[in-house]
Design a protein with these regions (language model features):
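Metal-dependent nuclease catalytic cores that hydrolyze phosphodiester bonds in DNA/RNA
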Residues: 1-88, 113
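A short N-terminal helical cap/helix-turn-helix that marks the beginning
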Residues: 188-191
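Charge-rich, solvent-exposed alpha-helical interaction surfaces
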Residues: 180-183
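Mg2+/Mn2+-dependent nuclease catalytic core
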Residues: 65-177
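Conserved pre-motif I regulatory segment
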Residues: 195-199
């Protein structure tokens, strides 16, 4: 009887952080603790998600499995949001930060990688030719500092950016995402296979 392969589960976030080793919720520059940052991050996530419109899907679960010789890799996570923009499906990743958004010129690589993973998994499973990726950064506030006023519907539009919120929208062909995702898994596999051999 053939032995059942071991399943290794890893979140999208842990996968990209392990490979890229940089960036995360920026809670260091404001002098506030991790708990404050998490609570503030949850508030801004909910604000943005509620203002996106009726066709917006929040917290979309996504799973991808790949079989290797000795084990099965299960990559899983939740996209912050998803919506249709014409013929293109857009995956949104929302990040809270204390940094100056007006000087931000591009998404943090590890954040963008997280969103691209979700875009590839959804695009593959739903036979999409291309996928949009919207990175949304919004300024956090703490209870000590006083809460910022709620974001307006105009501010959460992808084409809008100011000192409180910044958007980066990119479109990728699915073959481009597939090649990128495969390279990400190849980098992870080298480590995983080494660990397996030394068990």
């Amino acid at each position: 009887m053939e032995e059942k392969k071991k399943e290794i589960r890893i979140s999208v976030r842990n996968l990209v952080e392990f490979i890229l080793r940089s960036g995360d919720l920026d809670n260091s520059s404001g002098g506030f603790g991790e708990r404050d940052a998490m609570q503030a991050g949850t508030r801004v996530h909910q604000q943005i998600q509620k203002k996106r419109g009726a066709d917006y899907r929040a917290e979309v679960p996504l799973v991808h499995e790949k079989e290797y010789e000795h084990f099965i890799l299960r990559v899983e996570g939740r996209a912050d949001g998803m919506y249709e923009d014409g013929t293109t499906t857009v995956i949104e990743e929302i990040k809270g930060t204390y940094r100056d958004l007006e000087t931000m010129e591009e998404p943090v690589p590890v954040h963008l990688a997280q969103a691209k993973c979700y875009a590839y998994i959804y695009g593959l499973q739903n036979r999409k030719e291309e996928m949009g990726v919207l990175m949304t950064y919004t300024l956090l506030s703490s209870e000590e500092e006083g809460l910022l006023r709620p974001l307006t519907k105009e501010e959460v539009k992808p084409e809008h950016s100011n000192w409180r919120i910044r958007h980066f929208l990119q479109t990728y062909k699915l073959p481009e995402l597939e090649q990128w995702f495969d390279e990400l898994l190849d980098a992870w596999f080298i480590w995983a296979e080494f660990q397996y051999q030394w068990q």
